[in-house]
Regions:
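Extracytoplasmic entry segments of secretory-pathway proteins
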Residues: 1-67, 71, 143
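Hydrophobic residues positioned within well-ordered beta-strands of beta-sheet architectures
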Residues: 44, 65, 75-77, 107, ...
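Solvent-exposed coil/turn segments that connect beta secondary-structure elements
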Residues: 49-51, 72-74, 80-84, 93, ...
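Histidine- and aromatic-enriched segments that form or immediately flank copper-ligand environments
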Residues: 54-59, 83-101, 134
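Beta-strand-rich interaction surfaces with strong enrichment in secreted/lumenal proteins
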Residues: 64-67, 94-98, 108
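Surface-exposed loop/turn positions
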Residues: 67, 71-73, 103, 115
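Extracellular/periplasmic metallocenter environments
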Residues: 99-143
Length: 143
């Protein structure tokens, strides 16, 4: 028994530690990218209420049920609710954020292609929840 070599165990431990370090570093980098809101992002206040969405741009422009943004720009959504819990979702851009009364939650995105996308509520919010939808219009810059 005294001649038993521990090298295979040490190699196994070293490989596991290396893999765990690599996975941790990749996860940290992904979180940093997702959580970092670009400084030039335009803020849009998103308010959910039974049973529609309102959007207020930095310049005071308000939209109900539809949101117009420009391709290639970053947008920060400040999501809130006037009544009950909602959940703001743009499925095509993997945007999902809870809208809770008395609380402001933030999420950001940067559309990369012109097009139309569904906006919906992903939290049951009452009888007409199924109809709490909107449309995101990603357009060319208007210069």
């Amino acid at each position: 028994m005294g001649n038993h070599s521990n090298w295979p165990e040490w190699i196994y431990v070293a490989v596991v530690i290396a893999l765990m370090t690599w996975v941790g570093a990749e996860a940290w980098e992904a979180e940093r990218l997702v959580e970092h809101i670009p400084e030039d992002a335009e803020t849009i206040i998103v308010t959910g209420q039974q049973w529609f969405w309102t959007f207020e741009h930095e310049d005071g422009t308000k939209e109900i049920g539809e949101l117009h943004v420009e391709v290639g720009k970053a947008y920060k959504f400040e999501v809130m609710s006037k009544d009950v819990n909602h959940s703001f979702n743009i499925h095509d851009y993997v945007v999902l954020m809870d809208a809770i009364p008395g609380r402001v939650n933030t999420v950001w995105f940067a559309p990369d292609a012109v097009g139309e996308h569904d906006i919906q509520c992903r939290e049951y919010c009452g009888l007409i929840h199924y109809n709490m939808r909107g449309t995101l219009y990603v357009e060319e810059p208007s210069h």
